[in-house]
Amino acid sequence: MRRITIATMVAASLAVLTAPAQAAWHSYISHSLGFSVEMPGDVKTQTGTYRGQVSGPRETIIFRSVDDNIEYKVTVMSFLQAQAESASILGEREYMFQNEKKVLMDTFGRIEPGKDAIYGRKITVELPKNGGRTTGAFYFYKGKLYTLEATVLPANGDYASPDPGRFIDSIAFVLSRAQEGSTELKLPE
């Protein structure tokens, strides 16, 4: 009996040691942009540009990490002067995300309970030329368009991984709901 217990403990230890290394998930918050999210790995910040026919050219702030060949990305765009056009801007961004891709899921998204509820959209697409699979979530809140994208790259290939869903569903706009000890996301300089 003792040998079986020792053998089981050794086997369990070896299984843990041979498992692929994955970064720990952390809670991040941006007080200035008004959201919190959970992501694995080291988050990098950059700026980018976006152009839509309705929205026009926009500067974007992008928070990105990659872990286990899954790319996690939050993109924030300001539309403070165009809040009356929020439905059109949101719809345009959703359309551009899924355009010319095979749509696997398209459903409404909701975060925050009760009177704090914010509605948006969740879409999963298969990328062209076996480029992987991306799940996106889109929310327009207080004059900002928030886009979350989790792309399972072909090198990972585990399209049933729960990690993209964990990331997409972790966003919160009521900052008191962020985990205690969340790391402040740095804005680009």
Predicted regions and their residues:
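A short, polar/proline- and glycine-enriched secondary-structure boundary/capping micro-motif
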Residues: 48-50, 83-88, 114, 158-162
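Bacterial N-terminal signal peptides that target proteins for export
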Residues: 1-10
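Sec/Tat signal peptide C-region and signal peptidase I cleavage site
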Residues: 18-23
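A short acidic-to-branched-hydrophobic micro-motif
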Residues: 61-91, 147-149
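Signature of long, low-cysteine stretches enriched in small and polar/charged residues
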Residues: 38-62, 94-141
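A structural detector for beta-sheet-dominated domains
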Residues: 31, 38-40, 46, 64-66, ...
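Short acidic/polar N-terminal linker immediately downstream of export determinants
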Residues: 24-32, 50-53, 180-183
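Surface-exposed amphipathic alpha-helical segments
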Residues: 31, 43, 88-104, 144-189
